[in-house]
Amino acid sequence: MEAASTWALLLALLLLLLLLSLTLFRTPARGYLPPGPTPLPLLGNLLQLRPGALYSGLLRLSKKYGPVFTVYLGPWRRVVVLVGHDAVREALGGQAEEFSGRGTLATLDKTFDGHGVFFANGERWKQLRKFTLLALRDLGMGKREGEELIQAEVQSLVEAFQKTEGRPFNPSMLLAQATSNVVCSLVFGIRLPYDDKEFQAVIQAASGTLLGISSPWGQAYEMFSWLLQPLPGPHTQLQHHLGTLAAFTIQQVQKHQGRFQTSGPARDVVDAFLLKMAQEKQDPGTEFTEKNLLMTVTYLLFAGTMTIGATIRYALLLLLRYPQVQQRVREELIQELGPGRAPSLSDRVRLPYTDAVLHEAQRLLALVPMGMPHTITRTTCFRGYTLPKGTEVFPLIGSILHDPAVFQNPGEFHPGRFLDEDGRLRKHEAFLPYSLGKRVCLGEGLARAELWLFFTSILQAFSLETPCPPGDLSLKPAISGLFNIPPDFQLRVWPTGDQSR
């Protein structure tokens, strides 16, 4: 009897959803939106957008509907998609304020709930972003102090590589730990040893989160979270990973609170936030709350751990796949720096080919191919269409970095595309791995510095080899969703000048 009642309730619910979907799709609201495939009740555009191939499906639709079109992710989530350099720059650059809202990430929204510098909107976001940028700058980002901080961690990574003594190893964990330590130093004022079990668990949680939100299931969840959320599934493991990150963050914040003094200088981002909280504690409308503190630093920890490490890993993979490129990079480093002097940020101008290789690695990887979701902050006209306030927008950053109108043969690895006739670095306005506009990655300066110093220092210290034939290495992302995640590979490193081989 109870089973029959349950099935009757589910049937009634499905019928209600069907009627609601039909009602929504009959409204004239689509008239002012860009064209797109007709959505089906309950399914939206599932037939055109298969989870696991969401990005490629959107690119395929752009060939039919043009660079600006509308899709439905599930029955109600309506998204305007921007494809190619011209459309994305016109929106995020030309109408930056109107396109500056943060859209939905269903896999993470339950945890962040509109709090923290990344997920906030409106006045909350403006205050948190301004504060975070100033705090990072005051702590040395973009200055000599920040460079020295990164160089110290580089030395620790080089020493860890040396301990492998020519044995094959997967560099993923060490690279993630090294880049995470830079963030931990700035945010929490700590550095953790690579063999620390808690640190390794945090890295594994960050990696699991990245995999979870980019996986085919993660893409399905973005379309049907209303259906999948109450059911058992991989999202429970994702919540476990996020819980591990949050627990580590809470632990570090509580340590700061235990020794916090309002009269002392800020030693890290958490200190700076606590000082701001103390200054505004009498303001009932303040955005400097413990919730925003925890969500801001949790995001910084996650983003700073996985994104930079993944990019360095892909750059090393490319050098294994193309040994002649690695040889040319190493020759440039030896010629300009010699074996003894550590690379610095000021060396970029002296190492144009090395810089071009790093640019091309970022372009080819297209780490965030779908871009981060935006929303329209006020009803606006764009290319003859009227986009209502609250409309979600996907600016496909990967479609810029692989735009054949800008980059000839975009699927090929060709560092020379970033060099001019005189061998100097050529800047491309379509080189936008960090997006653009008001939501441009707030850690862009730090990311660029880390990529340069880690990459050049590794290549100065070691020659790189793969245990397998270079031609057998795949450059295709292991998972392609919100993020393009590079495949795992085995690496062997030999100290420069090693005569024992």
Swiss-Prot record:
It catalyses: all-trans-retinoate + reduced [NADPH--hemoprotein reductase] + O2 = all-trans-5,6-epoxyretinoate + oxidized [NADPH--hemoprotein reductase] + H2O + H(+); all-trans-retinoate + reduced [NADPH--hemoprotein reductase] + O2 = all-trans-4-hydroxyretinoate + oxidized [NADPH--hemoprotein reductase] + H2O + H(+); (5S)-hydroperoxy-(6E,8Z,11Z,14Z)-eicosatetraenoate = 5-oxo-(6E,8Z,11Z,14Z)-eicosatetraenoate + H2O; (12S)-hydroperoxy-(5Z,8Z,10E,14Z)-eicosatetraenoate = 12-oxo-(5Z,8Z,10E,14Z)-eicosatetraenoate + H2O. One of its GO terms (cellular component) is endoplasmic reticulum membrane. Pathway: Lipid metabolism; fatty acid metabolism. GO terms for molecular function: 12-hydroxyheptadecatrienoic acid synthase activity; heme binding; hydroperoxy icosatetraenoate dehydratase activity; iron ion binding; oxidoreductase activity, acting on paired donors, with incorporation or reduction of molecular oxygen, reduced flavin or flavoprotein as one donor, and incorporation of one atom of oxygen; thromboxane-A synthase activity. Its cofactor is heme. Keywords: Endoplasmic reticulum, Fatty acid metabolism, Heme, Iron, Isomerase, Lipid metabolism, Lyase, Membrane, Metal-binding, Microsome, Monooxygenase, Oxidoreductase. This is Cytochrome P450 2S1.
